[in-house]
Amino acid sequence: MHIMEGFLPPLWCLIYYIICIPFIVYGIMQIRKVTAESDEAMPMLALSGAFMFILSSLKMPSVTGSCSHPCGNGFGAVFFGPAVVGVLSVIVLVFQAVILAHGGITTLGANVLSMGIIGPLCGYAVWLGLRKLNVNDEIAMFFTAFVADLMTYVVTAIELSLAFPKPDFFTALVTFLGIFAVTQIPLAIAEGILTMVIYRFIKQQKPDILVKLRVISKEEAGVN
């Protein structure tokens, strides 16, 4: 999903930077809030960021000027909300652009918008919806990660189609989505399973963390 350096026209790069700014500012405020409220927040923030960095570094080349890979953005969204993931994604994407030549600085706004804002936001909406329907938290985590991953690529396809609407936007969008779908649907399923397994491990070993971060209730965690 990382759009490479210099691939987008400068105007679109600027637009995406501007769109991201208020989300990142709000995310920083949320990080200050959650770290002040709970001592467990900082290590979980680090884990969420590391999870995103590792998964999104496992890239497969794509002919779209982007690439395919897991995203790891649904995991942090469940623990801290999508705004915090936006801030984590900035850190992850800057490191990947500078150290791994994965993505770019000019395209940072576009990549943050897809992987750090809209993808996690959609995944978090799925989490809230499924939990209101009393769906098991582990199953809900699977679908959260699955949707966050896929929506990241839907947004990337939209960004590419807006920049290169040939012969028109909708035709370009169908083309980009079709190319991404071949690799991304299996990757999203695999990411959903991996995220669910890691979540289950945390729930079994440190259920109190999930309670303190208001992810699940004491009854679900089995703690007093």
Swiss-Prot record:
- Is Membrane included in the keywords of this UniProt record? yes
- One matching Pfam family is CbiM
- Pathway as given in its UniProt record: Cofactor biosynthesis; adenosylcobalamin biosynthesis
Q: Which UniProt keywords apply?
A: Cell membrane, Cobalamin biosynthesis, Cobalt, Cobalt transport, Ion transport, Membrane, Transmembrane, Transmembrane helix, Transport
One GO term in the molecular function aspect is:
cobalt ion transmembrane transporter activity
Q: What residue ranges are annotated as transmembrane?
A: 8-28, 41-61, 75-95, 108-128, 138-158, 169-189
Q: Does the keyword 4Fe-4S apply?
A: no
Question: Where does the source fall among the domains of life?
Answer: Archaea
User: Matching InterPro entries, A to Z?
Assistant: CbiM, CbiM/NikMN
Cellular localisation: Cell membrane
Give any Gene Ontology cellular component.
Answer: ATP-binding cassette (ABC) transporter complex
Q: How does it sit in the membrane?
A: Multi-pass membrane protein
Biological processes annotated in GO: cobalamin biosynthetic process
Subunit comment for this entry?
Forms an energy-coupling factor (ECF) transporter complex composed of an ATP-binding protein (A component, CbiO), a transmembrane protein (T component, CbiQ) and 2 possible substrate-capture proteins (S components, CbiM and CbiN) of unknown stoichimetry.
Concerning its family, UniProt says: Belongs to the CbiM family.
The task this protein performs is described as: Part of the energy-coupling factor (ECF) transporter complex CbiMNOQ involved in cobalt import.
Q: What is this protein called?
A: Putative cobalt transport protein CbiM
Please name the source species.
Methanosphaera stadtmanae (strain ATCC 43021 / DSM 3091 / JCM 11832 / MCB-3)
